[in-house]
A protein has these predicted regions:
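Conserved redox-active cysteine motifs that mediate thiol-disulfide chemistry
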Residues: 2-17
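Generic hydrophobic, helix-prone segments enriched in Leu/Val/Ile
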Residues: 13, 55, 62, 124-128
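C-terminal partner/receptor-binding element of secreted or periplasmic proteins
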Residues: 106-135
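Thioredoxin-like thiol-disulfide oxidoreductase module
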Residues: 21-22, 27-112, 116
């Protein structure tokens, strides 16, 4: 997950992923790594070296943060936080959902999770409930 210390949506995504109702689900299915980018001038030392280049490589450098990608165990791209038109390939820049909150964004998130894990219906429903919760 690409993030910055000043990014409110980044903190919200982190809090949601670590919420007691779904943390174990994510921990069993994903390894979450934080890469810090776009820090303010007085916090540039907190940026991870090479993170911006990595973000650019995966087409996320101009569409906002948080931005997340899912790679397989060999580092092959599987999915990311961009909603693209049906049938569009990875090279088509879409709309970044960042921290999913709207119905469309949460649906995209659930679709990605369903394709990149072995999550069952109950687990996906718990994630949906947490992300659609307005608190």
């Amino acid at each position: 997950m690409f993030h910055a210390s000043w990014c409110g949506w980044c903190h919200k995504l982190d809090s949601s992923l670590n919420h007691e109702s779904i943390k174990d689900i994510f921990d069993k299915n994903y390894v979450t790594t934080h890469l810090t980018v776009y820090e303010s001038k007085n916090k540039k030392e907190f940026e991870n070296p090479g993170a911006l280049e990595f973000l650019t490589r995966y087409k996320g450098n101009d569409i906002g943060i948080p931005y997340w990608i899912i790679l397989d165990k060999n580092g092959k791209w599987l999915a990311d936080s961009q909603i693209r038109p049906e049938g569009a390939d990875y090279n088509h820049v879409g709309e970044n959902v960042g921290c999913p909150a709207s119905r469309e964004e949460v649906n995209h998130f659930l679709k990605v999770l369903g394709k990149t894990s072995t999550l069952n219906g109950t687990e996906l429903m718990a994630i949906e409930k947490k992300f659609l919760l307005k608190k």
